[in-house]
């Protein structure tokens, strides 16, 4: 069953990238991230209420809560870097780099969870790495300045934080319902995202957001919420070294 959830996560994650790109053509990436996080948070807590798992919040241990918070911080950092990269670079180049976090996740899962390493996994890691390089070099970016490589730095940081998110999240949801865990960590992401907006004094830009872009940002939030719920349900039941590669398809 976890394989189905992992496939669902990959599907919604793919939609998220396209919708998000459409929503940040003119809108600042930090502001867009903060707004879509609100949508994800509402989506997550509604699901918790509908499934009746909110009662489990009193049973959460200190270790579980710590790793959920750390996972949320890593997610927030990954998001901020990812959407900054999308804003400055070509989606066809940014997304493959972000997806390459699979390689690091497999290695970290091997170290921390002792999930084992087979020839098949080694082959997959090599193919993912090769495929990433080919996709990055496949198309020239005709929209952005080719001399500006800041998107590359942000994309790499996004991949690193995304990998940490998977590992920390795997530990954090080991003892609680995955939907509740997703809602809690999304709350952390929300705080982090809005702090970034206010620290950079960008809150005034919210009023000037184009309605069409706002719609795409909201839709990307729903897609993200669906992807997260599927991902952490799959991660709770399946091995991280297999779930993450499926999610990154």
Where are the language model's segments positioned?
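Alpha-helical transmembrane segments of compact multi-pass small-molecule transporters, enriched
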Residues: 38-43, 97-111, 187-192, 227, ...
């Amino acid at each position: 069953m976890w394989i189905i959830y992992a496939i669902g996560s990959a599907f919604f994650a793919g939609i998220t990238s396209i919708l998000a790109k459409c929503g940040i053509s003119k809108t600042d990436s930090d502001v867009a991230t903060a707004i879509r996080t609100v949508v994800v948070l509402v989506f997550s807590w509604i699901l918790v209420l509908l499934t009746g798992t909110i009662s489990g919040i009193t049973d959460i241990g200190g270790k579980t809560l710590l790793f959920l918070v750390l996972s949320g911080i890593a997610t927030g950092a990954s998001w901020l870097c990812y959407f900054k990269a999308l804003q400055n670079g070509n989606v066809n180049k940014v997304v493959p780099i972000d997806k390459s976090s699979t390689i690091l996740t497999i290695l970290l899962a091997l170290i921390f969870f002792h999930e084992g390493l087979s020839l098949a996994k080694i082959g997959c890691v090599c193919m993912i790495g090769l495929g990433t390089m080919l996709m990055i070099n496949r198309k020239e970016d005709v929209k952005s300045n080719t001399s500006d490589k800041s998107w590359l730095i942000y994309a790499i940081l996004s991949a690193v934080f995304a990998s940490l998110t998977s590992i920390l999240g795997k530990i954090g949801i080991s003892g609680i319902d995955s939907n509740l865990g997703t809602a809690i960590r999304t709350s952390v992401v929300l705080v982090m995202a809005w702090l970034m907006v206010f620290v950079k004094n960008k809150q005034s830009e919210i009023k000037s957001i184009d309605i069409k872009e706002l719609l795409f940002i909201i839709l990307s939030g729903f897609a993200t919420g669906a992807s997260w719920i599927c991902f952490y349900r799959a991660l709770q039941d399946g091995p991280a070294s297999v779930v993450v590669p499926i999610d990154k398809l």
